[in-house]
């Protein structure tokens, strides 16, 4: 799991929200499958709406410049975002996201929620992750922050009591399907950068380990 503070700059966040004010929306259940469709209640921007391309451009630019996104998650591909609004009474009950998504389809290893509304402007709407061996984790971040978590985790969005929850959701295929390998690669990348900035330290040995680990396990 990874928190990305200030993924979106204030001007980007303002433009996204202005576009969302004017957008065309579909019933959110149209993008859900199986059990998820029966527990989902929200509105999502239609991919047929012409200006959705501008929303994609803004988020794409933010992801491209975000170093932790690249170095920790090792994305090989990711889906276009779903931009969603939740009003009072809306929720998304416990579910697991689909294995494949996007067009063309990609394997969905990591789910990422980008928060677009200040948390003080709505009550409820927390993202809850249900872990088998640890307590439920509740996430409600400032606008512009993002949170990435394993797609195979049971999670839900609690009912909105007042105000409006706005989010963008992206699904990511990682070069490293195994989350343990992905974490080791990210740790070694940090070690290499630390060695580069430490006087009288040779980064080559650990860089060699990193390169060989990537070579052995990298995939799509």
Model-derived regions: residue spans:
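Catalytic core of non-heme Fe(II) oxygenases with the double-stranded beta-helix
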Residues: 67-186
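Non-heme Fe(II)/2-oxoglutarate
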Residues: 1-75, 181-220
């Amino acid at each position: 799991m990874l928190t990305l503070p200030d993924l979106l700059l204030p001007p980007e966040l303002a433009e996204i929200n202005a576009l969302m004010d004017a957008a065309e929306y579909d019933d959110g259940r149209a993008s859900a499958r199986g059990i998820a469709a029966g527990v989902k209640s929200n509105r999502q921007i239609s991919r047929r709406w012409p200006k959705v391309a501008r929303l994609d451009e803004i988020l794409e630019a933010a992801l491209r410049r975000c170093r932790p996104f690249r170095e920790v998650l090792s994305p090989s591909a990711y889906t276009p975002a779903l931009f969603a609004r939740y009003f009072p009474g809306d929720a998304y009950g416990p579910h697991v996201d689909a294995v494949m998504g996007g067009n063309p389809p990609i394997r969905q290893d990591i789910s990422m929620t980008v928060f677009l509304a200040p948390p003080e402007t709505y009550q409820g709407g927390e993202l809850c992750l249900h872990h088998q061996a640890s307590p439920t984790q509740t996430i409600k971040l400032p606008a512009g922050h993002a949170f990435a978590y394993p797609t195979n985790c049971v999670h839900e969005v609690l009912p909105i009591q007042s105000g409006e929850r706005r989010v963008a959701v992206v699904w990511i295929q990682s070069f490293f399907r195994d989350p343990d390998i992905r974490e080791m690669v990210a740790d070694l990348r940090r070690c290499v950068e630390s060695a580069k900035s430490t006087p009288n330290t040779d980064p080559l040995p650990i860089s060699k380990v990193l390169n060989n680990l990537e070579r052995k396990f990298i995939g799509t």
